[in-house]
C-alpha cells in the first residue's frame, strides 16, 4: 500500500519469523506504575483535524493547556493521533506532527500528567466508515498488508517514544475497532501485542473491545494472559438520545421533543409528535428506564473482565454534546462518576475542547466550568 511501509514490512516479517522460531515473546512480570483516574481527550488536534496545519495546529494546544489541566486536578490525558497527520501516502514521516506529539508528552511530564497515545484513525480503518456507507474503506481485518502497516507504524512510534518512562506514557494501538467477527480483532490484538512486547516488554498497552469499544462486546475480548501492564478500555455514550441530542450526524438528529433523565427519556406525547421517519429508532426510548442502575448493569461485563485479567479498567470516551440541556447533562455525568468511583474505573471525558468539551480555545475561557467542578468531585489519585 505504501512504499516505505512495504519495505519495512519485508524486514520486519523476516525478523519476526526468525524470532518466532527461536524464542517465545513474553511480557515482563514486573508491573509498572502507570496509574490513572481522571483525564480528558485532547481531541481534534492531531486527529480528526483536516484543516489545521502549520501555526494553527501548533497553537491549538500549548503549554498553558497542560498547566491548566494539572491545576484543575486531572492526572492524565488521552492524545488521539491519525495516520494521515504522521505519515504521507508513501509512508514517509511528516515531522511537524511528531514534534507536536513529543512536545505534548514533554509538557505532560512537566505538569505531572500521564498520557495515553491513541492511534485513532488509520488509512485502512476508520471507526465510522460503516455509518458513512463506506464499509469498503476498512481493509484492516482482511488484509495482511494493512495489518503489517499497523505494526510498522507502531515500530516507528515506539522508536520515537520508548525513551518516555513506562510509568508515564501508555500506547493504545487502535481506537474503536470494527471487525465483522470478534475473533478477527482478538487475533490482531495478539499479533500487535507480540510485536510491541518484543520491543517494549513493560509498556502499558490500552486494549478495547470490538465494535466501537462497546461495553456489549467486552465479553468477547481476549487479551494475552499474564501481562499485567495492560488496561482494558471501553467507551460509553448511552443513552445516545441524551448525550447526542441534536447532533447532526446521528439518526435522531431531527428529534426536537423533550427528553428526561433519569427515567424514561421520551413521553408518549413527544413520541407521537415526532417525525414518522425516526419513530423506529426513537421507540425504545419510550419504554427503557435510564438511570444509575442501568449504567451499573451496562458496565458489569467490563468490570468482570478487568477482574478476570487483574488489570485496570478505563472508560476512554464518554461525554455530552454541548447543546444538550445542562441540567440533564450534569445529572447523567454525576451518575457516571458515581459508578466510576464505585468500581475504581479510570476515565477520560470526550473532550477538552470542541463540541463535547468544557474549554473554549478561541475565547481562551471555560465554556462549562460547572461541568469541570462536577468532574473534580470524583475520586482522584491519592498520590499524583
Model region roles, listed by residue range:
Residues 1-9:
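Bacterial N-terminal signal peptides that target proteins for export
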Residues 18-20:
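C-terminal motif of bacterial Sec signal peptides marking the signal peptidase cleavage site
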Residues 22-32:
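Bacterial Sec signal peptide processing site at the extreme N-terminus
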Residues 36, 144-289, 296-321, 342-343:
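Active-site region of glycoside hydrolase catalytic domains
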Residues 324-384:
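Aromatic-rich peripheral "rim/lid" segments of glycoside hydrolase catalytic domains that contact
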